[in-house]
Amino acid sequence: MYPAHLLVLLAVCVSLLGASDIPPQPLNLYQFSNMIQCANRGRRPTKHYMDYGCYCGKGGSGTPVDELDRCCKVHDDCYGEAEKSQNCAPYWTWYTWKCGSDGPQCDDSETGCQRSVCECDAIAAKCFAKAPYNDANWDIDTETRCQ
């Protein structure tokens, strides 16, 4: 084997070792993001919902700050119910849906866990599209406002 080949092989191995420390992203969040874009017809980027209020984004506590934040709390609760009643892993559950004229629609062939998680996401995406967005509630200090 040529020395150049060994260097390339070593570089690939080192790259893979470094990548193993990066946590995988939940597959479902990609679908949920697309559902949000379907529901709001691309009027607001999905990232604007990732750190909003007390419940939009990772975790959640306290009282929702507004209607949009309530949508996120309902979504969190819906995922919690799917975990309990369907023994689901909502963040990892892949489902089939389409973007219709009324917004996201879950495929009728989906049942059980996939159906539950899809409905949680579709309902939340439609709720996001209807709720007003208050820039002052993005990236708030959750330690003081979400008790």
Curated annotation (Swiss-Prot):
Annotated EC: 3.1.1.4
Coarse class of the protein's main subcellular location: secreted
SMART domains per the UniProt record, alphabetical: PA2c (SM00085)
Keyword Amino-acid biosynthesis part of the UniProt annotation: no
Signal peptide: 1-19
Binding, Ca(2+): Y55, G57, G59, D76
Cofactor entry: Ca(2+)
Cited function: Snake venom phospholipase A2 (PLA2) that inhibits collagen-induced platelet aggregation. PLA2 catalyzes the calcium-dependent hydrolysis of the 2-acyl groups in 3-sn-phosphoglycerides.
Protein name according to UniProt: Acidic phospholipase A2 S9-53F
Taxonomy of the source species: Eukaryota, Metazoa, Chordata, Craniata, Vertebrata
